[in-house]
Amino acid sequence: MSEVKVNKISPRSGTDVTLGDSGDTFDVPSGATLDVTGATVTGLAGLPTWQSVTTGATLTAVAGRGYPIDTTSNACTVTLPASASVGDVIVFTDYARKFAVNALTINQNSLNYQGNSSPNPVYDTKGETVCIVYMDATKGWIPTNDGAVANEVPQTYSADMLIVGGGGGCSGGEYGGGGGAGGFRTSTQTLTEDLVYTVTVGDGGAGVSSSSQKGGSGSISSISGTGLTTITSAGGGGGGAYDHPADTNRDGADGGSGGGGGGHDTAPGAGGSGNTPSTSPSQGNDGGDGQSGTPYQGAGGGGAGAVGADGSGTGNGGNGSASTVTGSSVTYAGGGGGSGSGVVGSGGTGGGGDATLTGDGDNGTVNLGGGGGATQGDDGGSGGKGVVILNVPDAYYSGAVTGSPTVTTGQGAGSDETVIKFTGDGTYTA
């Protein structure tokens, strides 16, 4: 065997050097090193030529190429070549880490895939990279790698949150206090990718038919998860009752905001305490005190933004507080109005129910956490159910939710925020 020893091969003209002819084999002996540091190498078997990022719903793949695929906006179906040679390699990678939201489907295009002609393979794991090699007609394309690649450093992003408890209900019959609004709390916290955050949405308290029974208090709303400071908003306190001749149910109940006290000729009820349990900033306000004498009047339930009015005044429910977590200003957690003979209180802004002279009191607004309105007629109004809302950057929204929340993208001043509105219990995986 002839041997040629040189330190450098340079072209006699131009910039290309050709080694041998088609079909020739060049062996690199065991232990030798082929150093291509700093060079651009193309066309070597097993090394794909990487293409620009694919964002479309379909792609026709070519052997020897690598494809970064972005499924942020839509799923993608890749059609493999109709014919292939042994050793052909194609690579697909989850460019935006969104395969779990919008999957990659591979159309086999008549060739086998792992020895099967159907069904088409689907890759739906976040961060997945799929490298396939064509082996032969029997097995066809074989994945040499189809695993997920975890981030070496946990990825985090900021989320704005609104948590509103369920509003309180009211007594029935006459002179009842309005229901207190559910607690109103906001928070901005850091979420970590792949961790699960659990949401509970509180129901409104029940309105009752008896004038000797105070309305039911609302239930708590909360969000919790690993590394998260749990935020809990209390349910609104139930409105106090006329409760004649006894006096055990005249006071409004404590809660996120307190229920209004019931009216009575000699011993009216006191308003329930808001911000119970205590939080900073305060999650709500006190209910008003009922009025004695003629005409006796139930007081308004407390709202997130104001105390309920006393029965000696208007008996109106306290106004709620506004939040822009959805991208626009919405007012939540208004207190319910108290009832009296000839005069009834209005519900506070933010879903508080109005009191009525006849029929049933108005219910607090669902998913605003408003307190129910009292009545001089039949059943007291029920409190409105609470709500939990998350606002995260569009670019980081994972799409992994349970409990059927309403999800709206492209919100906020920059049209780049995703709003996740939970109207019932559920989870969000970041």
Please identify what each model-predicted range represents:
Residues 1, 25-63, 138-158, 283, ...:
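Glycine-rich, low-complexity segments
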Residues 2-40, 128, 136-153, 311, ...:
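Beta-strand-rich receptor-binding modules of extracellular spikes/adhesins
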Residues 6, 11, 19, 28, ...:
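Extracellular beta-strand solenoids
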Residues 9, 14, 22-24, 31-33, ...:
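Disulfide-stabilized cysteine-rich extracellular repeat microdomains
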Residues 31-33, 39-107:
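Exposed extracellular interaction/assembly regions and N-terminal maturation sites
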Residues 63-71, 85-97, 105, 118-134, ...:
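Short hydrophobic/aromatic-rich beta-strand motifs
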Residues 154-430:
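Low-complexity, glycine/proline-biased repetitive segments and flexible coils/loops
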